[in-house]
Amino acid sequence: MTKPSNFDPFDALSSAYETMYEHVAGGLHAATHKTGPMIQELIDEAEAKVSDLQDITEEDAKKLATWLKRDLDDAINYVTETEYALTDWLGFETALIKASFINALLETADPTTLALLRMKENAHEPYIYRTGEITGFGTLICDECGEKLHFHEAGKIPPCPKCHETSFHRIQTD
């Protein structure tokens, strides 16, 4: 069976990313004891599940798991290190995001839970987001010109529409 001529493999990866995110958010919401290692365990489970159920390679599933961990880690770091809300990290109104995704994230993103999940010993330099990777919802800022790219669902990171740079970051803490 051949794939349709309009088939976009990044659409499949975006869909798989969202499936993985839903699994992790659902697991966090249901858990009574939330820990950093538990998040990694949920991401690993989601990686195996999406590799089995969707038409993506194990290599792509591993990349998606890495990108999902990066996105969750960035959100957790931002909310726990600032006085700002998750909507500030996103960089736009949450009304633009599918309700199921934002509800799952907000239900698990209370400050107490996030504080428990934040592991200071694993502090890191800010993540660099590159063209061609998949990212979840939120705002990326071009490292070259400061242009903001808004993602209202998981999607492939394009080059900057203003300067064509391929390196981005999320809103950073002070």
Language model features by range: what are they?
Residues 1-5:
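Generic N-terminal leader/targeting and pre-domain segments
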